[in-house]
Amino acid sequence: MKTQQKIFMNRELSWLKFNERVLEEAENREVPLCERLTFASIYQSNLDEFFMVRVGSLIDQMLLDKNMKENKTKMTPQEQIDAIIPQVQKLNRRKDIVYEEMMDSLKEHNIHLVNFQKISKKESAYLRAYFQAEIAPLISPTIIGKRQPFPFLKNKEIYAVAVLETKNGKEKLGIIPCGNETFDRLINIPGKDAYMLSEEMILHYVPRIFKGYHVKAKTLIRITRNADIDADSMYDEDLDYRDFMVELIKKRKKLAPVRMELSREMDGEIIDLLCDYLELERKYVFYTQTPLDLSFVFKIQDILRRETDLFFEKRVPQRSPQFNEEMPIMDQIEKEDKLLSYPYESMRPFLKMLQEAAEDKDVVSIKMTLYRVAKQSKIIASLIEAAENGKDVTILVELKARFDEENNIEWSRQLEDAGCRVIYGLDGYKVHSKLCLITRKKKGKVSYITQIGTGNYNEKTSRLYTDLSLMTANVDIALEAAEVFQALSMGETVEETDHLLVAPHCLQNKVIHMIDREIEHAKAGEPAYIGLKMNSLTDKKIMEKLIKASKAGVKIDMVIRGICCLIPGVKGETDNIQVRSIVGRYLEHSRIYIFGTKGREKVYIASADFMTRNTLRRVEVAVPIYNTDIKMQLIEMFITMLSDNVKAREEDHNGNYKIPKNQDTPLNSQEFFYRQAYLNAENVNS
């Protein structure tokens, strides 16, 4: 037990450490001010989703079996929640401090976020008139009583809450929804570089709204609702699956609250009353000095857009030197494998390839998996055009992609209307693979182009996330990709492969086999190595095998952006394991697996993290890299990430993350890759 507890970290606590690293970017004064605002907003939205999904799941687990223990640290759901809450409170205090600091810094750029204590009588008169004309007609106040029950509070919406006293001394509760798309949230005070949030204005005018009452106390609140809902267990086979998902989204919006945030401290009795109405335990109440929703910072950024020193230097995805974009893309791939590295290189060659496939008379079919797609998608447009041109287009649209369900439902309708065959996913599994197969038949000869990536088919995120995309004409890979699509078409999963690693049946076991091979090399006194780049590591079976490898003398380097449940550097257990996390301008999203030392390396890129959900409960695909140049490129990229001493944090044997101690020349790996992409593009153009 003691050994396990010191080697493994609880998943939820590890995630909070990741979000702390996001908060550190907001705290970092070397980051441009407007970008710091972005990181603060990301920290907040990350925490929202954490409560909606992870804390919601823990609360559900307590209802099912309060003694249930997670398999790594043996913590019960209650123990996990008891550990989460003080950590969140601690991080939120840091968020409050850095927010105040950033607001002070904005004053130097003529942006003042004010309240009614900081304005003149003239400005107050303007705001009163503005409120009466623009806001008051649109709000819907409620007083809780016998004829008016406590209203349903929407997820992540802001409400003004007031304790009202009648003339005979009785207390009532008044509630006003503050969210309304018809009025601006960030209100400019004319003739001044000052702004006020609409919810603060509504809160100030609560006495005007509830005339005839004495306002004893008032605050802004925001509710976070559970979003952890199991689609598969609730599905009725008599229903159309797409219609079922539409209803499920509606149901999710009405799940139980898991958190309440307050903008002002309130009397304990009032908080207890709100908790009673919401059926929420008091421990899930959090007080914050920052606005309850930081999304308004993007409006501030728009105002300051011309002050370029407040933003990261502009970066544009560059032309890849591997492609001549004036020539047919598919013909170039047939000659040699190609790799695109986003966001450093442009997605254009892939988009052009799909458009070529839609128009090419020799293309007979296109098969593709879609998980998260842009709201305005050239990819979808090409697939629709291909179907309209008479090609066999089969698309698996994963309707269970969390928080993207509505977008995917709409795209699935459009694809179907165009004549595409649309598959909605699999029972019991999410299809998370990034797989595209194009089949051509020319003069009786069949050829294939297969694209396998680490990230979504999404033009927007390809500029914001680091991802990799392999395009190959390799027949062995194409035939196994075809097997994956055939299985998906029949509602099944692939059981065996020779080249691809395909979860849920033949990824985890093959990874473990490759770790075993490195253990054998180490035990024979030969150099042995494992390098892993991914978002998260939680799969206990793989982690236990990595511990065995470390004990055997295998050198293991891991670049893991988010959750890492394996603690490195523990004497006698994980001495040979190094873990780094990179949190920077772009979201690290690529997955790279490296097994073996120089001359015998096996290198893969994949859609899968080593999380139990990815290895056992999703359809994921990892592709081997057979092209020597691409293999070396990926290894060099991995080495560069390991050398990052600017945006990287190194995990120590206590599970804490610190800036690497080396005194080498500062290296920001993301900036390095972008400079490299610019140089490569210049060489192509010269």
What is the predicted function of each stretch?
Residues K555-V559:
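Hydrophobic alpha/beta core scaffold segments
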